[in-house]
Amino acid sequence: MADKSIIIIGAGLGGLSAGCYGQINGYATKIFERQPNSGGVCVSWKRKGYVFDYAVHNLFGIVPGTSDYHIWKELGALDGLQTYSFKEFVQVETPEGKKFIVYTDLDKLQNHMNQLSPSDKQKINEFVKACRRFRGYDLFAGMTGGMGAKLRLLPVLRSVMKYSKITTEDFAKNFSDPFLQKAFATIQYDLSGVPVLIPMIFMAAMSKGDAGWPVGGSSALASNIEKSYLNLGGHISFRSRVDKILVENNKAVGVQLEDGSKHFADLIVSAADGYATVFDMLQGNYVKDSIRTYYDSYPKTMPFGLEIYYGLNQQFDGEPHALVLFQDEPITIEDREYDRLDVEVFNFDSSFAGSGKTVVKVVVNSAYDYWQNLSADKDEYNKQKKRLADQVAERLDKRFAGFKNSIEAVDVVTPVSVVHWTGGYRGFCLPWPAPEQISGEVSKNGVSKTLPGLENFYMVGQWAVGMNGLGTAAHSGRNLIKQLCKNDNKKFKTTL
């Protein structure tokens, strides 16, 4: 029997992963990608000699012993790349000079927190004890993997359940020290509503040198996986936007591109945006209530929605790689007031800037409608981006002497930019938490790994799974091919 053919829509990490494992296991795959490069949202680009990186913050799997390490090894994702382990997760500062340094050395963190607030020793010790306990477990694999991975979590299951139900903000309210209370609430990328389990998982990993950085960033990671895919005999057609998934008798049979050309295969896999796949490419013909409920529940503002980049002719030696800077007075962005800024300093990756230079990024929540309305007038849209970059630079100049005068390159990424790059629904770069009424189903089955009534069709990536992360996307591609091998009575292989 001839090898089954698979068309994959999108060369993000989910699509590339599905392509690699498909090729290894005897499927004939081809990827259609709308952009001139692979990676999807795992991307970086150059401005005036500086590299601006969109995706990677903390990459799990840079040290042995986790499922992410194994998948990056299988995909060649880190081949030839140096990796960097962070000494701190984040440093939170006030204008008065108070600092909460989230050291990745747990002993050092515990001592630092107890010095900040001796009266909070009990709650501090509880947090650090949980981080230490989770060190011996691959928690993300347990939460997203099969029954075997879940069973391995049994010794810590009670703690996992407990801390998954407490937000970081609510945990912080238990501290009596006002500064520690407000600082602790911001440690997970300054996101709101995040279970305290998540920073515990991050700290457990970082204390072992994991959840670090691949030197070269997002594009280096994606480029390595693309190289593996091509070396395995795969094919990528760039600048090839899929407009429609072709269906005959409720079976997916091919795709139609923007130029009108049609391409056919035995199986169709979408690694593209979930909404665009279900409601545009398939015209909403194969939808269940939980999918509609999920996409109707989108938040009005999105994390990582605005990213402001600066290329600076200035060194930032000794500065933390991540900072939350509380402001002496609120800053107004998109008609909303913020009392702090989330800042990333790329002084640990020399490939991002020349000698004596550094890239700095500021991340802010954003509303798609605000920028979509502005984009109707291109001049006004660009003026507002410049005003925003200037406004934020003024604030950073107070923290970093000479910041404004050393700026050589600027870029501002809005939700409209993300729609242009990836077709992401309303500019979201990652999925949002499922509403309560479908959270159990999404946790168990994902949002849309398959669609009701449609055969020979599958989805991979963050949107299919309903959970964010580069590792999540890569695992979804692997898991799909493993399932296809089972369906076809093949032994699943991870190498040729």
Mark where each language-model region is.
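A conserved FAD-binding loop/helix module that cradles the flavin
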Residues: 56, 462-484
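Helical element adjacent to the flavin cofactor pocket in flavoenzyme catalytic cores
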Residues: 204-252
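Active-site-proximal substrate-binding core of FAD-dependent oxidoreductases
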Residues: 247, 486-496
